[in-house]
Amino acid sequence: MSKETDRIFAQPLSQVPDFAFNEDVVRVFPDMIKRSVPGYPTIVENLGVLAAQFAQPNTVLYDLGSSLGAVTQALRRHVRGEGCEVIAIDNSSAMVERCREYLNAQDSMFQELLPVQVLEGDILALAFKPASVVALNFTLQFIAPEQRLALLGRIRDALVPGGALILSEKLRFDDPQEQALLTDLHIAFKRANGYSDLEIAQKRSAIENVMKPDSLEEHRQRLLAAGFSKVVPWFQCLNFTSLIALP
């Protein structure tokens, strides 16, 4: 994957535009997310490990909001399910184009990987096939809050017995002191990874109108309302978490 350093917000901007997954972001995305999301590499690699426990023969494994395909690659490395395929979907044409390049490179390095389709489209309009694993890796937070329950309900309906949704998200906290502490710690994490205060502030301004995080309890209650029977947090680092939701 690209090793370009994220410098998108390094210079003062007279007007900070809303964050978008455009070509500029795609070019530096691996660096950006590694330096911005604590625990991201651990989440991605273990998504493959977890998926191998839930994958069922002759089903689909979905990577919804697949970006450059890091989760898709992890699924293909770890899952050996007869008749399984991975479907990765993203609404950014720049992401989809680069994702296909990376997956073609993966095909050239490894044998016996699951077949994969990479689609450009809106996951809200996706016609789900019977699925045993659905990964929503830092995707739900970019969907309008009023549309989240319906999407989760459709995912639940698509899951076969023994399958699972794996949901990773940034968290917000109802307690003001807890929110302030975790925000400060996250800023410290980004500083430690080389981001300046200007970059941190401008990125926050760019993303606050397009990313709307929920609390852990909001996630739990919504998943239960969507028909899931059990919600199990398996990972948290600072204000980022990953959950397993069982049908």
Curated annotation (Swiss-Prot):
Enzyme class, spelled out: transferase
GO BP of this protein: tRNA wobble uridine modification
Family: Belongs to the class I-like SAM-binding methyltransferase superfamily. Cx-SAM synthase family.
Protein name: Carboxy-S-adenosyl-L-methionine synthase
Organism in which the protein naturally occurs: Pseudomonas syringae pv. syringae (strain B728a)
HAMAP family associated with the record: Cx_SAM_synthase (MF_01589)
Subunit structure, as described in the record: Homodimer.
Binding site for S-adenosyl-L-methionine: Y40, G65, S66, S67, D90, N91, D122, I123, N137, R204
Function per UniProt: Catalyzes the conversion of S-adenosyl-L-methionine (SAM) to carboxy-S-adenosyl-L-methionine (Cx-SAM).
InterPro entries: CmoA (IPR005271), Methyltransf_25 (IPR041698), SAM-dependent_MTases_sf (IPR029063)
Catalyzed chemical reaction(s): prephenate + S-adenosyl-L-methionine = carboxy-S-adenosyl-L-methionine + 3-phenylpyruvate + H2O
Documented EC number(s): 2.1.3.-
One MF annotation (Gene Ontology) recorded for this entry: carboxyl- or carbamoyltransferase activity
Keywords: S-adenosyl-L-methionine, Transferase
Gene3D superfamilies documented for this protein: Vaccinia Virus protein VP39
